[in-house]
Amino acid sequence: MPNELVFDEVFAANRPEFVKNSGLNSFSAETALIFGLSQEHIIARNEVQLQLEALNALDGLIADAAQSGLDLAVASSYRSFERQALIFNRKLRGERAVLDDNDRVLDRDQYSDTEWLQAILRFSALPGTSRHHWGTDLDVFDRASLRGDLQLTVSESQTLFADLHVWLDERMAKDKSFGFFRPYAVDRGGVSPEPWHLSYAPLATLYENAMAPNLWREVFAELGDVLDNFNLLDRHLEKIFERFVAVPKGWCPDHYRSGLTS
């Protein structure tokens, strides 16, 4: 897997003019964190980028997995706004593959703009709304079971990495997963199930309710013309948030929301 820290350093050196000229100092520290516009909250360790508390919890999870013969590894952790915007715009333009639920590449010409947007959002977060911006979320796999290139698909999770995910299921059911749970465990008709996507609940629950359509609009008013087909996004924004951004509270035990992490 690519080194995301190196990626972001390269991207920063060649940062688009819309980021250079966006006046990021006008945003609060919390807003910059939530939208992936700052890396001040991020610590890099062994190519993994998370907040320090989440990194320390991850160390515990990895060590626990090793006791069960699993080599839990991280495919992706922190993701900057810039990177998410680059990915999203390339998909909007049809320059990067968009897949269906059966991992088949879709033909852009066969879809209306609205249908194409929905197909993208099934697997890729709207920039500024990705949980990977927060330094609390990561994608995992079992390095010892990897054969060939990593795809991060549901079928892969049910075959190559089945042992890892069964183990995670058991640890989460006992609340012994060091605070990590799955926000996209089931298909609710929006984001595709992502069994590999783990979120550190003690911190993630602090940020998820701060995201709202009006805040997104305020930030993008400052950033300027950074996303293709912005008018389409703006027109459907409330529905996008309802279907593809909001995650029901039941994704983690309630006590993590009160700051109690027994």
What residues fall within each predicted segment?
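Cell-envelope/glycan interface and biosynthesis
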Residues: P2-T261
